[in-house]
A protein has these predicted regions:
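FAD-binding glycine-rich core of flavoenzymes that anchor FAD
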Residues: 26, 73-78
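Gly/Ser-rich phosphate-binding catalytic loop and adjacent alpha/beta segment
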Residues: 63, 72, 85-89
């Protein structure tokens, strides 16, 4: 595929190794765990929960020209008013826009969008959801409505079906 990707499988294997060591040392005293990472990077999943096209990094070069493309679809002032997120090259919104502009078929088949900590939490728990604070970094979340920024999502031409439940931290 080209581009910059995270080796998410290796990261997850390291998490499992760490959990095994913690279990050996602390046993039943561990009652919960959480997944917290950087924001912006995401993975698209199919209906069976399989990754589509890898886990791209925010440094991926495919976003060249996407700020201008986004501006042509919705003024950045309007995006900021809706999301509270300043325009930046690493915004998830631009990367997802690039998926559509470059006709990535993964966007059409995607059943779910999960950000990095949400993907790890899904692999640990089997629950697909988007945690509110990391979702807020995507430039696709409306903090006033406490919901996806549908106006932005629609302006970018992104399929609504892949935007799932948003949950509070610690759930």
């Amino acid at each position: 595929h080209g581009g910059c990707y995270w080796n998410t499988i290796s990261l997850f294997e390291s998490i499992l190794e760490g959990l095994q060591k913690a279990n050996e040392k602390y046993g039943d005293t561990i009652v919960s765990i959480g997944a917290d990472t950087w924001g912006c990077d995401y993975t698209l999943l199919d209906k069976q929960g399989n990754m589509l096209g890898g886990h791209r990094q925010y440094r991926d070069p495919r976003i060249e020209g996407m700020q201008e493309e986004m501006e042509s679809r919705m003024p950045m002032e309007s995006v900021f008013a809706c999301t509270g997120v300043q325009p930046a090259f690493y915004n998830s919104s631009l990367h997802l826009l690039a998926e559509g502009v470059k006709n990535n078929p993964c966007l059409d088949i995607a059943d779910r969008l999960l950000f990095t900590p949400d993907l790890l939490a899904y692999w640990l728990s089997g629950v697909q959801s988007n945690e509110r604070t990391v979702t807020s970094t995507s430039q696709l979340y409306d903090p006033i409505k406490r919901d996806w920024a549908w106006e932005v999502i629609d302006a970018l031409g992104l399929p609504r079906k892949m935007f799932g439940d948003i949950v509070s931290s610690g759930t």
